[in-house]
C-alpha cells in the first residue's frame, strides 16, 4: 500500500452501503477511511457526525445507492450537507451503483423521471463531482450540471474471462439495449456477438426468444449491466442451450439479485455468473456459481486521478 496520500488533503469516507469496498478503495489509494459516525435517532432519522476536520480538503464519499435504496440516498444527502457546512474544498460522491437509474424516461403517461430527481437532489445538497460505474442509461450523465466520470466494468470482466482461456466464445446481449456493451466486450475478447430478440406474439402468450447470430457449438457469454430477479438472464441462457450453445457463462457489473434470483441462477444453464462488488453480496447469495471481482483498483485509480487533476479517460480502456 502506498503512503503517498496519508498526510494529504485527500479524504475518503464510507457510509453504510458498502464498507468493504470502501476499505479496499482506501487501501489502494494509501489512506485510511475518514472518521465519521452514521447512526439513527429513535424515530429512524439519520444522524451523521464527521469526527475529524475536513476544512479545505478534497473529500470522496463511497456510497452505492443499493438496497435499502432510500435509506442509502438519505445518508448520502445528509453526509454531503455535513461536509459542505464543515468547509470541505470539494465534495466528490463515488456511487458504484446508481439507484433509480432504470427510471430514466417517461415510459408511460404521468410517470416520474426519478434518476433526474436523484441527480437534482445530489447537486442541490452540494456535491461537486460524481464518479460512478456502468449507469443503466448512459444519458443520465446529462442529468447532472457538475462533472461526472462514468467508469466501465467491461475491462474488469473481460480481463477475467481472458484468463480462463475459453474457446469459440460468442458474446451475447440479452436484449437490443445492451448491444453497445456486448460489442465492447467482443472487441476486447476478439469475439463475434449475438443478440437475443424477445418478442411477445400476442397478449397473454409467453415471450419468444429469437437469437440473432451464430451460437451453435460455441461458448456463449451473456453480458448485462444489472441482474435483478435474473428472469431475463436465465431464460436467455436456456434459449442459448436449446439453440446449440455448448455452454453458457454470464456476467454483470451490478448484482442486485433480488427475490428469486439466486434460485433461478442455481437451477439455470449458466455455468458461472461473474459479478463485481459494486453492491454488497450477502453470504447467502455467494453460491458456487457466483464469482465476484473487485472494482476497488478501478475506482481507487479514478479518485487518485481526480485528486491529482489528471485525465480519467485512460481508465475507460
From Swiss-Prot:
D-ribose 5-phosphate binds at residues 200, 224, 228-232. It is found in: Cytoplasm. GO terms for cellular component: cytoplasm; ribose phosphate diphosphokinase complex. The keyword Phosphoprotein does not apply. It comes from the Bacteria. Mg(2+) 1 binds at residue 136. The active site is at 198. Keywords: ATP-binding, Cytoplasm, Kinase, Magnesium, Metal-binding, Nucleotide biosynthesis, Nucleotide-binding, Transferase. ATP binds at residues 43-45, 102-103. It catalyses: D-ribose 5-phosphate + ATP = 5-phospho-alpha-D-ribose 1-diphosphate + AMP + H(+). The keyword Transferase applies. Binds 2 Mg(2+) ions per subunit. One of its GO terms (biological process) is purine nucleotide biosynthetic process. Pathway: Metabolic intermediate biosynthesis; 5-phospho-alpha-D-ribose 1-diphosphate biosynthesis; 5-phospho-alpha-D-ribose 1-diphosphate from D-ribose 5-phosphate (route I): step 1/1. Its cofactor is Mg(2+). GO terms for molecular function: ATP binding; kinase activity; magnesium ion binding; ribose phosphate diphosphokinase activity. Belongs to the ribose-phosphate pyrophosphokinase family. Class I subfamily. Homohexamer. This is Ribose-phosphate pyrophosphokinase. It comes from Corynebacterium ammoniagenes.
